[in-house]
Amino acid sequence: MTLQKSICVVGASGLVGSNIVKAGLARGYVVHGTLRDHTDPDKAPFLQALPGAASALSLFSADMAEERTFDAALAGVDCVFIACLIPMYAGPSGKPAREMDDEQGYAEIIMPTVNGCLNIMRAADRQGVANVVICSSTSSTNPLPPVAHKNEIDHWSDEAEQCGAKKYTSATKTVMEKAAIKFAAENDMRLSILLPTGMYGPVILPAHMNGNPQAWLRALINGEAGRHEKVPNDSSSMIHLHDLAALFLAAYENPAASGRYFGVYDSWHWQDIYAELQRLLPEMKMPASLEDAPVPATGFDFTRRDSLGVALRDIPTLLRETIDWIKARPDTA
């Protein structure tokens, strides 16, 4: 008899983490999920209602600021997925990150995430967990000067430049990834890092409808103003949440996988995104038209991402599926 493998998802109630939990259960894994409070009535019941959860999901309380709180959740698991490193846009006092100096930005925005990630990795190492997959962001992959097609190996953001521009939230991902890579190398861990941005598709917790693209798409469906008053001269990178979860599992399941992987399907200019949305929602409130020539969309080299072997929905499909799902929700109208 083959024993089921166990995995741990840190940040199980997050947008990404909850989808990894769902995908892991569907693949037959025993899943340990961590939340700050595993009894939270606004979070836990929605995870416990997932297919397969009754027999294969256990929830644990853990806080990334406290390394030892992860010991129980990590005991006996084969891989830990770290999906709790959400962007921080303000410090404990509520002061916006963009108003901080470097000392405060590092102390209150960057280092809590870096130290939290390392706490989880130290706990995993202590429990003998050799496989780690981290959810980061494409914000760590913007080199200067910009390149036409960026890749995960050569192209990094400059954290000093990010801090100089008061982009401490973005710099957090850059600093965290480098620290995690160093720790993994020193402790013989196989580390993969997924780099997503705009995440579309069904959400698992109702609270996730209050932010993310699902919120402004719901507004458009209801005839309200959406995200922009005017089409921005910029692009947006996108992926379906189910495909992103599949990439996370593939990075774990492929023993040759390690390093950074883009977690996006592609990037479209906002002008093209709104054109597609208007095709799907002919009565929607369109933002004011772009007046200037559109800048090129972000270009990617997807060689490494494609090596994981996951088929991804294209942008028209992920937009349509997200809109159809929102329309079917009883609270949309």
Regions found by a protein language model. Give the residues of each.
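N-terminal Rossmann NAD(P)H-binding glycine-rich loop of SDR-like oxidoreductase domains
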Residues: 3-29
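NAD(P)H-binding glycine-rich loop region in Rossmannoid oxidoreductase-like domains
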Residues: 37-115
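Glycine/proline-rich active-site loop of Rossmann-fold NAD(P)-dependent oxidoreductases
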Residues: 186-189, 201-216, 250-261
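Conserved C-terminal active-site "lid" loop/helix of NAD(P)H-dependent oxidoreductases
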Residues: 275, 291-311, 317
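Conserved Rossmann-fold NAD(P)-dependent oxidoreductase catalytic core, especially the SDR/UDP-sugar
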Residues: 86, 91-167, 192
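A conserved pocket-lining segment of Rossmann-fold NAD(P)-dependent short-chain dehydrogenase/reductase
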Residues: 160-166, 199, 206, 212-239
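Mid/C-terminal beta-alpha module of Rossmann-like enzyme folds, strongest
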Residues: 233-235, 245-294, 322-333
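Active-site Tyr-X1-5-Lys
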Residues: 162-192
